[in-house]
Regions:
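Bacterial N-terminal signal peptides
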Residues: 16-28
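Extracellular and organelle-lumenal recognition/adhesion modules and their flexible linkers in secreted
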Residues: 397-542
Length: 542
């Protein structure tokens, strides 16, 4: 009986492989399906479940010389091959070289391979799969990043391809320990969506929804009308109308979770941050788009990627200009840090996968095995560090100002400043003018002011107050004349000059996204005095 590599031909101490696998079967309970997330409907068991929950298998790919020559000339064009795993044999399996700029290797080197099982033989499956990938993991020496990150997405409610490890041989040449991933195909869609008849797009390399993305599954030939409609929604100038249309076309909750996890795992090369490494599914029954993660072999490497950041992908950039959705994004990160992205949740799964990996490291050359173990320990440490960093970022993040139910807030805790920033000389309380009156005297040309920083969500606002002047001489000024209100970076209309009794003041402004603003109550002039009633300072959302 043979199991794994041919016991007579493999030099990696393969004679111990059956014993290791049997031990692993007892340890893990091979064949158990993935645990069902609380609050969701249990899915039916699938023929592929044992591939990802059972023992690590070996695969031998045999390609005829003529087909090898074809892959040397056209590595992305599938050729027929024979695939073996244990006593199982599959003929006419489509095989091609895969990989992006950093991971592509030639067929004669350490190639990453895509196996289209039914490419040349309709209906054929390998362990229940139509399509699978054998990744060389040249950018992830731990062979763990993709598997662990995909598990995070699935537990958070975002579909992601399952992964496991595999020992791979090509034409009798041992390639070593690979990461095996299920492919994005019809089978994947059927397992994860109620309606699997929609269009599944491959984002390709640095391509966005304004382009004709490659169709992996769906309506043939593609007309990209659904992508064009999504792009058109993102270009709507009016923020309210844009939000309404995106809410109809995008699975809002899953997109917020997807984006949060992209940042939490420091996925600098995914869709939100770089318009790369993603799939996009248009589910017809719901008529909504769902973004799916891909290419997660370089995670947790950016020493504290900030969560408060801008985004490059068209949908992400427009989506998170909306203040409510941006606030929901931060809240989702905070929520995930309590129930999914925690060391108590991640590390047991990580350690179980590590233990599963250990079952086959005995079959790998000693130096290579030790290198893998060191990389696994390093990745584990980076995950712990990232969890701590995220908690610190959430704790230290400035919170948007909370307005009262009527959309207003009384403004207090002002800081005084004069034109040269020396602590507000010429500014003082004046009890004779009122219990909370502030007086600003201009003994020489200047612009004394009161200032207050607030973080505000998108919207239209009116900054209100009350002021008076005496003998205020104020010539024309680029930012405003006399006594008045404004926010930093904006110009106000002329204010009070000369001598004036108490008058209401106001300044209106609009924010397109959540923004930190500096409110300013100022006196600009050559000489004279001005007063502000600090009890009257108020901000109202229009």
């Amino acid at each position: 009986m043979k199991s794994g590599f041919d016991l007579l031909r493999v030099p990696w101490r393969a004679r111990s492989f059956p014993v290791l696998l049997c031990g692993w079967l007892l340890l893990t309970g091979c064949g158990q399906a993935e645990p069902v997330k609380a609050g969701t409907t249990a899915r039916a068991a699938h023929a592929s479940d044992t591939l990802f929950s059972g023992p690590v298998l070996s695969f031998s790919v045999d390609i005829a010389p003529a087909q090898m020559d074809s892959l040397r000339r056209e590595p992305r064009k599938s050729v027929p091959a024979t695939l073996r795993s244990g006593t199982n044999v599959w003929e006419s399996v489509g095989v091609r070289v895969k990989g992006a700029a950093g991971s592509t290797r030639s067929i004669d080197d350490l190639p990453a391979l895509t196996l289209n099982v039914d490419k040349f033989k309709v209906g054929q499956k390998v362990y229940g799969l139509d399509k699978l990938h054998l990744n060389n993991s040249v950018q992830d020496p731990s062979r763990m990043s993709e598997i662990i990150c995909a598990d995070l997405y699935r537990r958070a409610g975002v579909p992601a391809c399952r992964g496991t490890h595999a020992l791979v041989r090509l034409n009798g040449r041992e390639l070593g320990l690979y990461v095996l991933k299920e492919g994005f195909d019809k089978s994947f869609l059927k397992r994860n969506f109620a309606d699997a008849s929609g269009n599944l797009y491959d984002g390709g390399f640095l391509r966005d929804i304004d382009q004709q993305l490659e169709l992996d599954a769906g309506k043939e030939p593609p007309d990209w009308k659904d992508l064009q409609a999504l792009n058109a929604a993102c270009q709507i100038p009016d923020a309210g109308l844009r939000r309404a249309q995106l809410a109809r076309m995008v699975d809002v909750e899953r997109f917020i979770t997807y984006t949060a996890l992209q940042v939490m795992t420091e996925d600098w090369d995914g869709y939100p941050c770089n318009r790369n490494n993603y799939r996009l599914y248009h589910e017809p029954s719901a008529n909504r788009f769902i973004f799916l993660p891909h290419g997660m072999d370089q995670m947790f490497r950016h020493d504290g990627m900030p969560i408060d950041r801008g985004f490059e992908g068209i949908v992400a950039a427009q989506f998170f200009q909306d203040s409510e959705w941006r606030t929901a994004y931060f809240n989702r990160i905070e929520s995930l840090l309590t129930n999914v992205f925690t060391t108590n949740s991640i590390l047991p799964s990580f350690d179980a996968t590590t233990q599963r990996l250990e079952a086959v490291l005995a079959l790998v050359p000693k130096d290579e095995a030790e290198g893998i173990r060191a990389s696994v320990r390093d990745l584990r440490g980076r995950i712990v560090d990232r969890t701590r960093n995220l908690q610190q970022q959430i704790a230290g993040r400035p919170r948007p100002t909370q307005l009262a139910p009527d959309g207003s807030i009384q403004l207090a805790n002002w800081q005084s400043k004069n034109a040269t920033g020396n602590g507000g000389s010429g500014t003082q309380r004046d009890a004779l003018a009122g219990p909370e009156a502030i007086r600003m005297d201009l003994l020489q040309p200047g612009q004394p002011s009161l200032r207050l920083r607030l973080r505000l969500p998108a919207g239209a606002y009116r900054f209100e107050g009350r002021g008076r002047t005496k003998d205020l001489d104020s010539p024309a000024d680029a930012k405003g004349v006399g006594l008045g209100l404004r926010i930093s970076g904006m110009i106000r209309t002329p204010g009070l000059v000369g001598t004036s009794d108490w008058q209401p003041l106001g300044f209106e402004f609009k924010l397109e996204g959540e923004t930190e603003v500096e409110l300013i109550a100022e006196v600009r002039g050559q000489k004279g005095s001005g007063w502000f009633d600090t009890r009257a300072f108020r901000l109202r959302r229009k």
